[in-house]
């Protein structure tokens, strides 16, 4: 096919995505590399694509064509300016397209000898959101990157000084955090805070502690609010209030700072916690509610609701069941019998503790007792 025929075919495939997605995706997957080889980036830029889905689907072709021309910096620029928010995989309908975008971004940055460590964070998020193709692409990219750098496993701890031990825990906390093991990450960051006398290192650990706690749905932040942690307390406030709009505003207005600290994509993961908190609040208020109503209340795509509700149930944040597009909240009501059993158990425990106390209870002094002891 010549360029004109390829463009006509691509436009037809893209327009079919909204009406007959299965057939359109089959055609796209079979022909995408043909489009890349035969269509110039300038031609693609001139296309008038109406929907966001069509535009996202066109980007892999644009990036692929640029990669063939070895315009690596331009690929990086396009992704950073237009596609960063999509790489986290929030919309699973974009899974295949995002996977291709990540592949070309990784290859471009690799050719420019640039850092690709953000892929660790993207891997965790896309795993959580069920983006199978993107996860497959990122996994292979990371394997390529690690093997290329001769990194095959974690480094054993053989550090003896306190200051270096603090830094070692800080670095290991970052590894655990990007992998999604927030419990282990918190242990490392807490250890770093305790051992370190370096103010910058402690501040970096505190920022990551807050993010890990929020990602674990734990809002008992152990630090006072101060200017250096302002962004993180704003994010915490948005998550607790389930305010997705405020969360996204805070994230985007502080994007440069978060990117410079390598925390933008980690903080971006909190979007799911915002929605989870919203679902939790809905489960308290409503005993029965449809997916469409949940989507309307939270301002999200109705197609994503079922997955998110089931995920929230699996995490144990809410109790309920789903059937035929309806969520039914299940509340645990304590019966009078349960309360009675609880009181009985408390009394038995108190008696047991008293019986096993090391020293007898001290009784108040009185004349009769003193006289009795004196007479003995």
Swiss-Prot record:
UniProt key word Cytoplasm: yes
Coarse class of the protein's main subcellular location: cytoplasm
GO annotation, biological process: ubiquitin-dependent protein catabolic process
Cellular compartment(s): Cytoplasm; Nucleus
InterPro entries to which the protein is assigned, alphabetical: CSN3 (IPR050756), PCI_dom (IPR000717), WH_DNA-bd_sf (IPR036390)
Gene Ontology annotations for the cellular component aspect, listed alphabetically: COP9 signalosome; cytoplasm; proteasome complex
Complexes and interactors: The 26S proteasome consists of a 20S proteasome core and two 19S regulatory subunits. The 20S proteasome core is composed of 28 subunits that are arranged in four stacked rings, resulting in a barrel-shaped structure. The two end rings are each formed by seven alpha subunits, and the two central rings are each formed by seven beta subunits. The catalytic chamber with the active sites is on the inside of the barrel.
Function, in words: Acts as a regulatory subunit of the 26S proteasome which degrades poly-ubiquitinated proteins in the cytoplasm and in the nucleus. It is essential for the regulated turnover of proteins and for the removal of misfolded proteins. The proteasome is a multicatalytic proteinase complex that is characterized by its ability to cleave peptides with Arg, Phe, Tyr, Leu, and Glu adjacent to the leaving group at neutral or slightly basic pH.
Protein name according to UniProt: 26S proteasome regulatory subunit RPN3
Lineage: Eukaryota, Fungi, Fungi incertae sedis, Microsporidia, Unikaryonidae
Gene: RPN3
